[in-house]
């Protein structure tokens, strides 16, 4: 699910943090990709009759088709993808997963009804909602990646958190996912729409965390607190707290501790906290996720030559793909994986870490920016109140 309305807030408050460009702009870069999110997007690309792509035996092949051709497109454009699969979900996420399961059950019932009486749009809508990435989908995609020579890692828990660790360590340029909570896990750069189909004509969004924090006038802890308030996978949202209110609460109070205290002391009880709302546990999951360290041998990956005959056996013999297309794709893969060894110029220069003095100056700058925003909001309130108190018709 990610973080509700976070992209919209960044777009409005920190527009300089977002760059949009073509896939070819990522040439020569290694990217850690949230595999489960990608597979889900391949599976929901259903036809208007509500059916996924299938072979003659009636087996779903949408996930394999998407994984093969979208990965091929990335490699064609000089990108070296590293896929990261989800492990076991954190216990705190069980409530959200239960809700998703319930929604999928309801969608399945809705789909059956739509097939009887609904329009093509209804069928497509409900079909998307019933989609679930299974262990079999993951296992088949892992088998395919191995045959393609593309590395993958299975994270201990959340794939986005593992992608973020690899990006922080400089093992990859960025983490790629549609889930905005990748930024909460401290990924310096998030790429969105990287595994979308070419037909969708969606530009690649490149979001820089440092510029997000600068634009919002926040430190990372405040940013994570804002994301928890907006609504994340770990907790129920607070009723009546939307994006505008969440942003104002963080700017006024500075932390979730103070926000919770103010809500509990409010005699009017304008906002009522959910009965079980362990926000500190949620914050800990963002700051200390269960991940493999970047120097773990499992994270020491290589891009290998594809196994052409293995690809033909799996995709053509077992899954009914076109042999000509698979062989052509395998040849492109081998050729372009070699050519993507060419490094970008920026790869020769390591970023110099900030000194304590620079960090302190940056913190002061954020605090000053936050104070300016508070003063501006206060003045706007005064101006509104003054305008209301004026008699009608007064100049």
Swiss-Prot record:
Region feature Interaction with PCNA, mapped onto this chain: 341-349
Description of post-translational modifications: Phosphorylated. Phosphorylation upon DNA damage induces relocalization to the nuclear plasma.
Subcellular localization, as worded in the UniProt entry: Nucleus, Nucleolus; Nucleus, Nucleoplasm; Mitochondrion
EC annotation from Swiss-Prot or TrEMBL: 3.1.-.-
Keywords associated with the record: DNA damage, DNA repair, DNA replication, Endonuclease, Exonuclease, Hydrolase, Magnesium, Metal-binding, Mitochondrion, Nuclease, Nucleus, Phosphoprotein
Cofactor note text: Binds 2 magnesium ions per subunit. They probably participate in the reaction catalyzed by the enzyme. May bind an additional third magnesium ion after substrate binding.
Binding site for Mg(2+) 2: 179, 181, 233
SMART domains linked: HhH2 (SM00279), XPGI (SM00484), XPGN (SM00485)
Pfam families: XPG_I (PF00867), XPG_N (PF00752)
GO CC terms in record: mitochondrion; nucleolus; nucleoplasm
GO terms for biological process, alphabetical: base-excision repair; DNA replication, removal of RNA primer
Domain of life: Eukaryota
Amino acids binding Mg(2+) 1: 34, 86, 158, 160
Role of this protein: Structure-specific nuclease with 5'-flap endonuclease and 5'-3' exonuclease activities involved in DNA replication and repair. During DNA replication, cleaves the 5'-overhanging flap structure that is generated by displacement synthesis when DNA polymerase encounters the 5'-end of a downstream Okazaki fragment. It enters the flap from the 5'-end and then tracks to cleave the flap base, leaving a nick for ligation. Also involved in the long patch base excision repair (LP-BER) pathway, by cleaving within the apurinic/apyrimidinic (AP) site-terminated flap.
Assembly mode: Interacts with PCNA. Three molecules of FEN1 bind to one PCNA trimer with each molecule binding to one PCNA monomer. PCNA stimulates the nuclease activity without altering cleavage specificity.
Family: Belongs to the XPG/RAD2 endonuclease family. FEN1 subfamily.
Protein name as it appears in the record: Flap endonuclease 1
Phylogenetic lineage: Eukaryota, Fungi, Dikarya, Ascomycota, Pezizomycotina
Recorded name of the encoding gene: FEN1
């Amino acid at each position: 699910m990610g973080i509700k309305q976070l992209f919209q807030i960044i777009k409005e408050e920190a527009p300089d943090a977002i760059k949009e460009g073509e896939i070819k702009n990522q040439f020569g870069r290694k990217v850690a990709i949230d595999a489960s999110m990608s597979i889900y997007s391949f599976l929901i690309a259903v036809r208007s009759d509500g059916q996924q792509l299938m072979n003659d035996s009636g087996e779903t092949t949408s996930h394999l088709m998407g994984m093969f051709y979208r990965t091929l497109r990335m490699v064609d454009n000089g990108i070296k993808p590293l896929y990261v699969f989800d492990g076991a979900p954190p216990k705190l996420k069980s409530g959200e997963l239960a809700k998703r399961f319930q929604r999928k059950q309801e969608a399945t019932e809705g789909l059956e009804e739509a097939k009887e009486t609904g329009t093509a749009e209804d069928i497509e809508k409900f079909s998307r909602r019933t989609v679930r990435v299974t262990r079999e989908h993951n296992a088949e995609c892992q088998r395919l990646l191995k045959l393609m020579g593309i590395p993958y890692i299975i994270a201990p828990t959340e794939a986005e958190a593992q992608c973020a660790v690899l990006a922080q360590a400089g093992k990859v340029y960025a983490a790629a996912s549609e889930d905005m909570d990748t930024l909460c896990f401290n990924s310096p750069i998030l790429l969105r729409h990287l595994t979308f189909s070419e037909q969708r004509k969606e530009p690649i969004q490149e979001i820089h965390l440092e510029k997000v924090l600068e634009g919002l006038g926040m430190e990372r802890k405040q940013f994570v607190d804002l994301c928890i308030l907006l609504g994340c996978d770990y907790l129920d949202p607070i009723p009546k707290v939307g994006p505008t209110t969440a942003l104002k609460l963080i700017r006024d109070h500075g932390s979730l501790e103070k926000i919770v205290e103010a809500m509990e002391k409010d005699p009017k009880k304008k906002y009522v906290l959910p009965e079980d709302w362990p926000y500190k546990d949620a914050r800990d999951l963002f700051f200390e996720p269960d991940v493999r360290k970047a120097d773990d041998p499992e994270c020491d990956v290589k891009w290998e030559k594809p196994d052409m005959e293995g690809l033909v056996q799996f995709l053509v013999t077992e899954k009914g793909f076109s042999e000509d297309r698979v062989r052509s794709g395998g040849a492109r893969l081998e050729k372009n994986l070699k050519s993507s060894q060419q490094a970008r110029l920026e790869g020769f220069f390591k970023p110099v870490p900030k000194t304590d003095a620079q960090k302190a100056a940056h913190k002061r700058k954020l605090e000053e920016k936050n104070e300016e925003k508070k003063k501006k909001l206060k003045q706007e309130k005064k101006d509104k109140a003054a305008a209301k108190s004026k008699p009608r018709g007064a100049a």
